[in-house]
């Protein structure tokens, strides 16, 4: 467990890991962390715009449309039913807080929840109250089916180490020795990138005692 007095900046590290994950496809996307959705103090963790309507191959981006709202929970936080409705409300506010009517089409919105613990209680509530169903699309990636807005759930520790290496390593429970050593070696090849630096800083501090 990390005992560093200074709070680890998980959200900037997640934003960096997210951009890294998309690799060459990131150039088609606009990433806007902590996007303010109105003049009031409400903000989306990350807003990803696909203005060019590129069909993404990356597994976490296949669900994406033009405007993609992402809610991220750090390793210490759980995703609950109130988080679901808050983020859903943010998506609706983002669609409506525009200068002209229907500037952002509802069918161009998606919602992604990224967390570390499978939210059983939240999903059970959605299944009971909203008749949602959960469909696994890939390792750690689930679609919540039953709403007009496409919704996906990403469980960081369950992501593929092959296809989502950097996001999968954004954790505070890397195994001492092998996983940490491999992370350092992989990072050393990209250490001049500010994105990789932000990610590595959080990961190394979170796993410092190991």
Q: In which residue ranges do the predicted regions lie?
A:
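Elongated, amphipathic alpha-helical interaction scaffolds
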Residues: 1-210
